[in-house]
């Protein structure tokens, strides 16, 4: 099959690289220095799956009008703030794409894609896979889970095109599953990245990492308060936690616990992670953006909970204060 990655940064390079290594035909659209390095030296990926040097089945270009031929799947992976610019530049691809999906963070992006390319050509997708650009031609893959990607029709159900992309990801070593309700996966993923990112960026400052905060009572209390409020919204939408991205997901365990029990659970989780990973400490990408002085995705990752809570009439003071803290800093950051 032929894939086109629109926004081949860290995650796009990781996913596209593994697909190409498994024999799929992949076209990357990305920044000039990175694309030139891939053309000249191939793509190097390091991380949880070991070290890989991919040299076959890849075409690297810097603009959509340089991409040739038809594509079975167009995967959108630019930052949320860059979506409109990317779509405007990619109009030349519209007649040549059979199906389109977004692996970006957030809720609601699929409706924008339906407006752009047509309702029937957009499918739902979600991944927790981690990807960071280390330099031109080099990407890190620091995070994965046994099932790292989910695909489904946005109106429900599993079709052949859903099965085909699921099988392609599986062949590439990216554990994937087809699901009947992709919207539930998207919302649960948002709870996961929203709680971790909101907590990390609003509580841990410039020096601390996730595990550092979780092992303290005050840090664990703040995290539990945030998770409980986000899960209240998730429940109000008619969903029950499934731990789609286990073992990273712990919502099925935290959800039924009382506040104090949940705090103890999170503190134990923090101690386990400190012992398990030692000096390999973790921050969310939103927190990293804040530390490095770059615009964050706070409006993509946290604001949907603020808006949905207002719509549903649910009080979420921790979510709201978390959003305000990060948004205030975000106003002064560079794009």
Predicted feature descriptions by range:
Residues 69, 109-189, 194-195:
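Rossmann-fold dinucleotide-binding core
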Residues 183-211, 218-231:
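Active-site-proximal catalytic alpha-helix in oxidoreductases
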Residues 94-97, 138-153, 201-215, 283-292:
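Helix-loop-beta segment of a Rossmann-like dinucleotide-binding subdomain
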Residues 1-51:
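NAD(P)+-binding Rossmann beta1-loop-alpha1 motif at the extreme N-terminus of oxidoreductases
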Residues 43-60, 193:
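N-terminal glycine-rich dinucleotide-binding loop that anchors FAD/FMN and/or NAD(P) in oxidoreductases
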Residues 52-140, 150:
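Rossmann-like NAD(P)(H) cofactor-binding subdomain of soluble oxidoreductases
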Residues 224-335:
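NAD(P)-dependent Rossmann-like dehydrogenase/reductase catalytic/cofactor-binding core
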